[in-house]
Amino acid sequence: MAPKVFYISDGTAITAEVFGHAVLSQFPLEFESLTIPFVETLAKAEQVKRQINDCFITTGERPLVFHSIVKAEIRDIIYSSEGVDYDFLNTFVAPLEQHLGVSASPVVHRTHGKANHGYEARIDAINFAMDNDDGQTMKHMDQADLILLGVSRCGKTPSSLYLSMQFGIKAANYPFTEDDMDNLKLPEALKRNKKKLFGLTIDPVRLHEIRQSRMENSRYSSLKQCRLEVKEVEMMFKRERIPYIDTTNHSVEEIATKILDVTGLERHMF
């Protein structure tokens, strides 16, 4: 039976999930999880406590409980459950207060709430990424922090959206298609912003598999076409001295982190 995990918060529970996933990923196990956000009242906390206790009664195993709860009275109710508590927020606050010489002033929803200073940057960047996805328009390239290039289905769109959502980076992306292969070159709008260009490439066999799932047995998805496009685009990256990375078998989080590391782009938010 898969171990049971609860992610609980008086906010969005995103922080509890991220922390919990990071820790549990170190173990070669499958977990069954339940996320419970916005536990903002004593009544809701008691309800969650009953869920945790019922889980213990049903399985005979104490569930893991990762939580980031600001209000002490709500946190105490969760503490009194039959779960194994991992309160990472409170674990780090006291030592930091001692080190910084300043008392914390906890506020619910501060981390992922609208009042957070990075909220507007996040929304602007997300809108920019969607408006400038897949070469829809070349009018706003001057406003981009980053322009991702590559063949179709190499990871440009998810990387652009992740960079915008997670770091507030205005990322556009531009695809090189089958029609470009005979005379592959940078459009003028990209040449003007060459310092912002960053390439993504991918193993042709993996690209073939991805395209097959969308357009099976087509010229677009053929291994021959995938090999041709990847080869031509990589040659252009080298010719134009555009930095690039291989996205094969990497998660969007890993791709985004590598891009930031190579480019030195500053995160606009955390």
Curated annotation (Swiss-Prot):
Assigned protein family = Belongs to the pyruvate, phosphate/water dikinase regulatory protein family. PSRP subfamily.
Q: What does this protein do?
A: Bifunctional serine/threonine kinase and phosphorylase involved in the regulation of the phosphoenolpyruvate synthase (PEPS) by catalyzing its phosphorylation/dephosphorylation.
Top EC group? transferase
Give the HAMAP family listed for this entry: PSRP (MF_01062)
**Recorded GO MF terms:** ADP binding; ATP binding; phosphotransferase activity, phosphate group as acceptor; protein serine/threonine kinase activity
What is the organism field in this record? Shewanella sp. (strain W3-18-1)
Q: What is this protein called?
A: Putative phosphoenolpyruvate synthase regulatory protein
Name the EC number(s).
2.7.11.33, 2.7.4.28
Q: Which InterPro entries match?
A: Kinase-pyrophosphorylase, PSRP
Query: Could you say which residues bind ADP here?
Result: 150-157
What keyword terms does UniProt attach to this protein?
A: Kinase, Nucleotide-binding, Serine/threonine-protein kinase, Transferase
Task: From the UniProt record, list the reaction(s) this protein catalyses.
Answer: [pyruvate, water dikinase] + ADP = [pyruvate, water dikinase]-phosphate + AMP + H(+); [pyruvate, water dikinase]-phosphate + phosphate + H(+) = [pyruvate, water dikinase] + diphosphate
